[in-house]
A protein has these predicted regions:
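Class I S-adenosyl-L-methionine
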Residues: 123-125, 130-176
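Conserved SAM/SAH-binding beta-strand->alpha-helix loop
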Residues: 25
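A short glycine-rich, Lys/Arg-flanked "PGG" loop and its adjoining helix->strand segment in the class I
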Residues: 92-106
Length: 176
C-alpha cells in the first residue's frame, strides 16, 4: 500500500466498496494510516471501508480464499526484482497470479502500473500464462489513459517528473 496516498483517495471516493491495503513494511503502514485518517477527516467521513494490514503477499492464501470473491487488485509500482533469480518474487509473476486467481472472482481485474520496462513486458507474459486476458495496456499512461480515473501515486509523480513513461494494464481473469 506504500504511503497510502492512492488507497486513501480511492477508498474515500468509493464508500460502498471495501478495501484491504497490504504492505510488508511497518513504517509504510504507519504513514498509510496517517494519510488515510487525514483524507477521511478532510472529507468529514469515517474510514469504515478500509483495512490496512501487514502481510507477506506471497502468503496471501492464508487470509483470502475463493469465497472472498475479490473484484479488483491494484498493483502500483511494486519492486521489479530485476535479477533473474529473484523474478519469482514479483507481484505479477505467474506463481503469484495463480494465487490471486483463487480469490479473484470470475472476470475480476488486476490494475497494474509501473515505471519498469522489463517488469511490464514480463508481466504481459505472466498474465497470459496465468489465465488473465490483458484487456487494456499502455506504454504511456499519461498520454494514453486507460483507467476511468487515474489516481496518481507518489512514485508515479516522481517517475513522471523525471520523464519516465508510466506503463499500465488492466487484466481480466478468464476461464482456463
Amino acid at each position: 500500500c506504500g504511503k497510502g496516498q492512492f488507497i486513501s483517495e480511492l477508498a474515500s471516493e468509493n464508500l460502498d466498496i471495501n478495501y484491504i491495503a497490504i504492505d510488508l513494511v511497518d513504517a509504510m503502514l504507519g504513514l498509510a494510516k496517517r494519510n488515510v485518517e487525514a483524507k477521511y477527516k478532510e472529507k468529514n467521513i469515517e474510514p469504515k471501508n478500509i483495512v490496512l494490514t501487514r502481510f507477506d503477499i506471497e502468503r496471501i492464501l492464508l487470509i483470502l480464499e475463493k469465497q472472498d470473491e475479490i473484484e479488483r487488485i491494484y498493483i502500483n509500482f511494486c519492486n521489479p526484482w530485476p535479477k533473474g533469480k529473484h523474478r519469482k518474487k514479483r507481484l505479477t509473476h505467474t506463481r503469484q497470479l495463480e494465487k490471486y486467481r483463487v480469490f479473484l472472482k470470475e472476470n475480476g481485474e488486476i490494475y497494474f502500473k509501473t515505471d519498469d520496462d522489463d517488469l511490464f513486458h514480463s508481466s504481459l507474459l505472466y498474465m497470459e500464462e496465468a489465465g488473465f486476458e490483458v484487456v487494456k495496456k499502455t506504454y504511456d499512461l499519461h498520454a494514453e489513459p486507460i483507467f476511468e480515473k487515474n489516481i496518481e501515486t507518489e512514485h508515479e509523480k516522481m517517475f513522471s517528473d523525471q520523464g519516465i513513461k508510466i506503463k499500465a494494464l488492466i487484466a481480466r481473469k478468464i476461464e482456463k
